[in-house]
């Protein structure tokens, strides 16, 4: 499978079979107030309409993070830094421990949310809530 890795801020070139949506690629993590990948994910998913695989990679740290991305339309979620931290601390065992913990958190969050399978992670299971005052949105 070919994967194109580039900045996605708006719907753009859709010739490759997969796109990785990451805030690292467009300063979402470095510039305070920049749009986050999770906020733009539904727009990108709507635009490509199932024509390509969307891989989400942006600050995934918990099972809830995974569910949010899947509910908003990502086909898969990539986890990098936490696994690297585990690897640095205890090699392969550390990386595996991080992944096991993340998967346990995912299944617990799914259970508490009434979601039985990953296939049930759909947009009707999530909503955007805007809190008055600071103008920031929470997903």
Give residue ranges: language-model regions:
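Glycine/Thr-rich beta-alpha phosphate-binding loop at enzyme active sites
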Residues: 1-44, 86-89
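Alpha/beta catalytic cores of nucleotide-metabolism and tRNA/nucleoside-modifying enzymes
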Residues: 39-57, 61-139
């Amino acid at each position: 499978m070919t994967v194109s890795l580039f900045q996605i801020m708006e719907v753009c070139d859709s010739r490759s079979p997969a796109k990785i949506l990451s805030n690292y690629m467009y300063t979402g993590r470095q510039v305070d107030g920049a749009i986050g990948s999770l906020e733009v994910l539904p727009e990108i998913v709507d635009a490509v309409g199932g024509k390509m695989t969307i891989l989400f990679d942006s600050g995934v740290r918990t099972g809830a993070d995974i569910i949010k991305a899947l509910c908003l339309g990502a086909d898969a979620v990539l986890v990098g830094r936490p696994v690297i931290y585990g690897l640095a601390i205890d090699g392969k065992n550390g990386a595996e421990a991080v992944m096991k913990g993340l998967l346990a958190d995912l299944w617990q969050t799914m259970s508490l949310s009434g979601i039985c399978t990953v296939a049930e992670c759909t947009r009707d299971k999530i909503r955007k809530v805007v809190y008055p005052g600071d103008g920031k949105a929470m997903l």
